[in-house]
């Protein structure tokens, strides 16, 4: 199954995996006329706050390269020697304005997409975070990728999030929350 990613590129979602690895950033060779492959990694998460009905989650909206608005979980690349957890906390705060504290690992998703010069195999590590401060804003996003941010009830995310693989991460978060109550 192929869909367009937040950056407008075609992506093929793979299964949710619990493996952890850093992207090498290296290219596989251009054998038999195939595009070289670059490994990328990101981290982000499901940041929750108590709401009148269960929990709300901070999500962001971005325009893909085709100009379509897509709602997704906040995420981004680790910087320097950041761990996935540190990158997730930083990216969530940059893209949503909400400071979060990690509660648990929710697993990883993998997908492929192609840009004109290469194919990208991307792994995104997700964490469940508790909101501990801040206010919703996109003003802290240094890349200005997010065009909107919103608190959405956890039970409504399945119909709002643009990507099936992120909806599966939210289902994992729902199960973790249910198991802890």
What are these regions (language model features)?
Residues 16-73:
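N-terminal strand-loop-strand
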Residues 1-15:
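N-terminal acidic, proline/glycine-rich, low-complexity intrinsically disordered segments
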Residues 68-72, 147-150, 171:
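A short, polar/proline- and glycine-enriched secondary-structure boundary/capping micro-motif
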Residues 17, 159, 164-181:
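Charged phosphate-binding loop/patch that engages nucleotide di/tri-phosphates or the phosphate backbone
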Residues 78-168:
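Unchanged
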């Amino acid at each position: 199954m192929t869909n367009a990613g937040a950056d407008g590129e075609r992506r093929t979602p793979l299964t949710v995996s619990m493996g952890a690895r850093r992207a090498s950033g290296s290219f596989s060779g251009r054998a038999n006329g195939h595009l070289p492959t670059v490994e990328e990694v990101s981290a982000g998460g499901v940041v929750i706050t108590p709401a009148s009905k269960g929990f709300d989650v901070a999500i962001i909206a971005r325009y893909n390269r085709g100009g379509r608005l897509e709602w997704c979980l906040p995420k981004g690349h680790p910087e320097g020697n950041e761990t996935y957890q540190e990158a997730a906390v930083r990216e969530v705060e940059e893209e949503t304005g909400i400071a979060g504290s990690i509660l648990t690992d929710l697993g990883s998703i993998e997908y492929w997409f192609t840009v004109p010069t290469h194919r990208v195999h991307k792994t995104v590590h997700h964490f469940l975070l508790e909101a501990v401060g801040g206010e919703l804003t996109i003003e802290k996003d240094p890349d200005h990728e997010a065009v909107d941010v919103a608190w959405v009830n956890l039970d409504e995310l399945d119909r709002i999030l643009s990507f099936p693989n992120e909806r599966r991460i939210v289902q994992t978060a729902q199960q973790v929350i249910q198991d802890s109550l």
